[in-house]
Amino acid sequence: MESGLAGSISGDGLARIKQEKPEWLLQTVASQATEKDKENIFQQQSGLPPCQTMGRPRALGSQEETGGTRWAPLPEQDAPLAARVPGTAPGPLSPSLSAGGGHFVCVDCGKRFSWWSSLKIHQRTHTGEKPYLCGKCGKSFSQKPNLVRHQRHHTGERPFCCPECTRRFSQKQHLLKHQKTHSRPATHTCPECERCFRHQVGLRIHQRAHARNRLGARVNLHEMFRYAAARRWSCRLRPGSPRGHPEWVWLGLCRSWWGQHGVRTTAHSRLGPSEQRQFICNDCGKSFTWWSSLNIHQRIHTGERPYACPECGRCFSQKPNLTRHLRNHTGERPHPCSHCGRSFRQKQHLLKHLRTHLPGAQAARCTSCGQSCPSRAALRAHQRVHTAAELLRSQSAVRDGVPGSESQAEIAQSVVVKPQGPQGAKEVLCGQECETLAVPSEQRQFICNECGKSFSWWSALTIHQRIHTGERPYACPDCGRCFSQKPNLTRHRRNHTGERPYLCTACGRGFRQKQHLLKHQRVHRGTQAPHPGPEEEL
């Protein structure tokens, strides 16, 4: 049998071995060589250390495609080493081999990977496997780095710091995105006021403000304020300049035009991040730094609610609102108190509860049971429970004939009010009757056993108890949403029917709810007094 090695003896008596051409040697030992041997031959031929060829694709195809493990050299450096029949010229590789790719192929989508671990992680997208579980909220992830980034939301860790402004971020990509605001020059200049912008879209939005300025210069400035106030109510903003911003920023106007007309801005009119907001809502004039924030805000005007609850069908405009709502169905309480171990569904409820553990919370502690309350108002509401319990015990003692309980029963009877008619109420104090115009909350005769709140009517107590029981007997026939009170269902159905029964007598605009009409009528009070309806005159 021919051998790929030829031997010779030198003059010093030592045997020397001569190695033949690598391609012929490879053809000879291809059937017996292992993958490691072939890799060593390639590295010796190319003159590269093992670290430079490690991880590069050397095998293409899978056992399902070729009927076995297929081995092929690299198209750039290892083409001369491909096994071929002696005497034939080396031809080009097939397209499947020269296209490159990884050693490991996904059987579901055909994507190739150079490492087995990469293929294993990729296959979790097809199987849905998420082996990394968060110990705080129970959310699972397919990769460990995603879990590490998620846990920073619970711990509040922000390891990435901006060297320019020392602002910190929980993810590196957020830091890189933020650093562009420092490095990117403001090359887009407004020809009218010479204000500079980093993005072309910011300049276009700013130029729209100039167009509005030219139109607004021909109208009264007070009319502009009233129009902006009317749009502001639909945006759920409070009266006045929002968050202390200057009026020209709030209205989306140009600062130079605002200064030329001698209009005085607010006291806090320093240049700051609020004045660099580029995305302005066309409906109410509110400005935002990010396009995503403006997109979410515009759902207030359009009424879009793309996030639906799979349990009850209720829709929300933002995903965090849906997440908090789902905890009502699952019972999840991801926010525990570090002092007493009590858990809450929302973080704001936890912060409110933590006030009871502060040193000053001793002043709002119940003297009967020792329970701490977040405020004195909550303490008074809590003490009504003890008062109601004492009244019920005294009344039951009178019915059972317990001696010495008549005095307590007389006290209990003195604080019970019995309505006598629509003109007023009669109360019994010190054995005398007198008419009262208002019944104090402590003298209402129907008391809730859960929270101690009192009511003058049994129907009001029945409606109130649905808060504790969760009963919602009034269902919408269109979307299935349920309500605890019928008036709430009536107002909700106007969203489906489009009915607007409350009309403005000044401009004829219709509203679904009366409170929206009353807010709107404040716009007309500067020019003409609104005509009160029959319900407002009462």
Swiss-Prot record:
List the InterPro entries.
C2H2-ZF_domain-containing, Znf_C2H2_sf, Znf_C2H2_type
Its Gene Ontology molecular function terms?
A: DNA binding; zinc ion binding
Q: What GO terms fall under cellular component here?
A: nucleus
- Subcellular location, principal: nucleus
Annotated region (Disordered) at 35-73
- Mind listing the UniProt keywords for this protein, alphabetically? DNA-binding, Metal-binding, Nucleus, Repeat, Transcription, Transcription regulation, Zinc, Zinc-finger
Specify whether Amino-acid biosynthesis is a keyword of the entry: no
Coiled-coil regions, chain positions: none
User: Can you tell me where the transmembrane regions are?
Assistant: none
Pfam families xrefs: zf-C2H2 (PF00096)
Cell compartment(s), UniProt: Nucleus
Query: Which segments does the record annotate as C2H2-type zinc fingers?
Result: 104-126, 132-154, 160-182, 188-210, 279-301, 307-329, 335-357, 364-386, 446-468, 474-496, 502-524
Q: What does this protein do?
A: May be involved in transcriptional regulation.
Query: Would you identify the family this protein belongs to, as annotated?
Result: Belongs to the krueppel C2H2-type zinc-finger protein family.
What PANTHER family does the annotation carry?
C2H2-TYPE DOMAIN-CONTAINING PROTEIN, ZINC FINGER PROTEIN 200
Name under which the protein is recorded:
Zinc finger protein 775
| Organism the protein comes from | Mus musculus
- Lineage of producing organism: Eukaryota, Metazoa, Chordata, Craniata, Vertebrata
User: Gene behind this chain?
Assistant: Znf775
